[in-house]
Amino acid sequence: MDHRICCFLFFILSSKRKIIMKALVYTGVEELIYRDEKDPVETKGESILKVHASGICGSDMHAYHGKDERRIAPLIIGHEVSGVIQNGKFQGKNVVLNPLITCGKCEYCTNGREHLCPNRVLLGMNRPYERQGVFAELVSSPNQNIYEVPDHLNLNEAAIAEPTAVALHAVLIGENALKKPLSECRTLVQGAGAIGLLCSLILSKIKGNNNIVMSDPNKLRLSNCAKYFDGKFVNPADKEIKNDSFDIVFDTVGLEVSRQQSISVVKPGGVIIHIGLTQPSGEFNFRKATLQEVTFIGTYCYTNKDFENTIKILADKKIGKLDWIEYRELKKGAEAFKQIHDGSCSSPKIVLLP
């Protein structure tokens, strides 16, 4: 057979070969399987990221518990990620991905509030099969969602850019709603997970707030957070948390019981920043909220500007050491989810490494 024909046939057969990566796949309630999956498909306007590190978010836990109708099994979940781009104009660059993909054309996108875009989708939630989440060796992302990181920012640490942006956005929204500086406020942070700790670090190390109380029923997490900023660390039922005693409350939990406590303990004229999404409904003391002019604000994700500023915050180490992050192998990700579920994990953030 002619040599040129042989080469052509080899090229055709090679181009049809299925390229396989490893991924952690959500397959059902409290079930994750580490298995082979097809590589993401190269698409116009997108680039392929070789994942370096990916963080487990509270919303990933919601999916794990079967409580997120937007994340339908089987699905590669995960959206907090850092890595190296494999193709296109960013090829070879160390980057993080903004997982919130928006239309860029609506009134929100054109006015700096991209996170409220009615057409938004999220990596690891509601994208097509071939472009799913980041608990994998590879993931595809629109080029406009790619953010380069400076060489001195470790990619392991860069992986928490997304939750840090969530916390920064919440703190800035709270700051704008207050009638006095954050540095003068008595602050309650409900929840000793990653968002709770990141809010506290931004409040204390960037905003000069040294009067923070953090509450959580999990003693392991609470004692771990106590290593990283000065404050009081208590159980939600502790006597330290008195009615009408806090200028601002950050609810990073989002349970009915945490909302009830937030409205009870906030001062007249105070501010509640609601970040957590665990329970979507429940009782709330609207009488107090009305008669005492309490400001209740839900905060969702972050703007593009918040995301850019977060990379600078991490690169400049403005929130201190990040040795509270715990790293696990992606292939052992199912075990990490189980430990977060049963409360035996003390770290506020687990990051998975492929």
Show where each model-derived region lies:
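Mid-domain Rossmann-like dinucleotide-binding core that forms the NAD(H)/NADP(H) cofactor-binding site
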Residues: 153-237
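Glycine-rich beta-strand-centered segment in the early N-terminal region that forms part
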Residues: 40-54, 68-110, 150-152
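C-terminal hydrophobic helical "lid"/dimerization subdomain
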Residues: 260, 304, 308-354
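Cysteine-centered motifs
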Residues: 6-7
